[in-house]
Amino acid sequence: GSIIGTFVPTFISIPAVGTSITFLIFAGILLTLSAVYFISSKISMMKIKKLPVAILIFILSCVFGHNGSFAFWQNNLTYEGESVYNYLQVYEDDRQIALSTNVIFGVQSVYLKEGTLTGMYYDYALAAPFMSGVYENESNDMLILGMGTGTYATQCEKYFSGERMTIEGVEIDEKITELSKKYFHASDKIKVTTYDGRAYLNAIDKKYDVIMVDAYQDITIPFQMSSREFFTLVKNHLKENGVMVVN
């Protein structure tokens, strides 16, 4: 039971049909097993009569239970859904469009409708191209590990577009990349690879002027991207005057 309960939801049912329906599937399995037991064993009729009540509750849950929003604290969401890795919310107001993943407070990515600076850490990270010699280099290559919906990439494209800058992104969650194009005006000029950031560095030889590390799982840094080996790997993919910037 523990093995099935661990691996089937994680690798099969949640990616295929989502969390709500996964709960209903397993509830149905448990209800079926209980019904078989009550009917086949010598249980008093009084207890067996309670079985239709459980079946009725299950049917009502199937009809009404999977349509409710998880984000009961948030009204007027532009988008709400699940991916293999995250529970995703996109919300919009007069000033911005924002993406949140798995958390009540905070945002994962943001797009300012007026095209201004965000007032967040992305603005400070704009110093990295200056440190790598963006105006002196014949060409500038940037890699963003943890692309999200492209907040940092959009800013760099706006402020350094005339400096022959090529921006590449790596994002493990393909659904977030889809949302970036649908809601966050992500540029088609920016190549985004669906892959783990560390695995991507292991697979390529190219070197960059700037490597931005902004990979998070919820509010924690992935363990494989916080080790000495990882930072050595990043260093080996930087040009002579290359700069790494980390959120």
PLM regions: where:
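A short, flexible beta-alpha/helix-coil linker loop
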Residues: 104-108, 216-219
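Basic, ligand-binding patches in group-transfer machinery
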Residues: 37-104
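Short acidic, glycine/proline-rich loop/turn micro-motifs
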Residues: 109-113
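Electropositive phosphate-/nucleotide-binding environments in soluble metabolic enzymes
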Residues: 84, 119-122
